[in-house]
Amino acid sequence: AVHTMLTELGLNRSPVDYVIERLSETLRAPVVLEDSAHRVVAWAPGPGADPGATESARTTDAGRTATVSTAAVSTATTNDAEAILAPWANLGGRDLELPEGWERVAVEARGNRWGSLTALPGKPHPAGRRTVLELGAFALALDRLADLDGDQWLELSSKRLFDVLLGGRYRHDTELATQLAASGLPVEGRVLVGATLTGIGDFGSHDSLEHAILETALRRAVAPEGRAILTPDATGTLLALLSFPPGDPRIDSGGATPPLAARLAHELSMLLPDTTPANWRAHLSLGVPGRRIGGLITSLERVRVAGWLPAVAAVGRVTVQQAERQPLAYLMRGLSATPAVQEFAENALAPLLEHDRHGGPGHSGDLQQVLQAYLAHPTNRSLAAQRARLSRSVFYQRLALIEELLGVDLADGETIATLTVALLAHGGTS
């Protein structure tokens, strides 16, 4: 029965996480799938892990020893991610020497080895724990043979982690840190940054190619010292969790252009097809770097909520917005969903928005964009007109109309501050 079930799962190309769950239920023990770099792809806690050996597993690499307490794993609650995944969180890409009572089999076929399946201590199974694990590995190997792109495991691991992080599916920060580290994103002693990356303009080819190039370029820009976990959101924007060693120059915010953006631009220049339209850009949004899990979560959430903002820097095909250099914009985008802020923005901009909604003579429909350009350069109207792509005379006429509609003086500092906040809260791009 077990053989039939697991074979059917493989032939049906059942989702990897579902296969792991069924294996865990069958063995009544935690089961972990790792890739060839020893990063956790998927895991399941099992309905009740049996207390097993109390020895420690030691993994040695170039004189360094990683100690894994199997007692901690054995006595953990069945959904204790921190205890179950701790061995993988401490590996740093090294192989794990299995403690007594653990079973591991390779996921491989036709000379390709994609990773390993590990079962933690549990009760004996009539068919044999190792036999069940081997059948599960066979089912996973069948699925990998059918995965021509070879990205399924990476996508699954990334999506799982973002679901955990953004959905609050963890009990405390150390549990989340363990899950991230086990999946290849080291946390302890690292500088952590949340970011988003999206293509702007016509790419000239299929969306899947654009996404693949953006993801590959960002991974290369972060490597080799940095680590990244990436996944697309519902709109296609690439969400990123980045981890760098302390002092890494790529996250230095002191210069006019973030070094990470320059590195990304270089990688894109090596990957983009010659047919890519000249106006296409990759827009990178960088959150505030931090050293704690809570800071990483805040960093990612703020760049997600902020959406697109005008670039503070550009290099090659890359434009950049930075939370550290645009704190007001990020703050107001974060508060824009609150009723009080929405009401403030609507009241402050109502005549202008109403004017833009109506067509006909005298209604250009671009007053919001004109105001955005002016507020970005309030002391240089010539530059603001250039940014708005209008002649100076037409631009000045639009400003006069805005002052008339809103009953304000656009040269007044308080007015500039009020309208800047209102536009940001309303979702404008100023």
Could you say what each language-model-derived stretch is?
Residues 152-430:
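Cytosolic nucleotide-utilizing catalytic cores of signal-transduction proteins
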Residues 1-163, 188, 225-226, 267-270, ...:
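Alpha-helical/coil-rich non-catalytic "connector" segments in signaling and regulatory proteins
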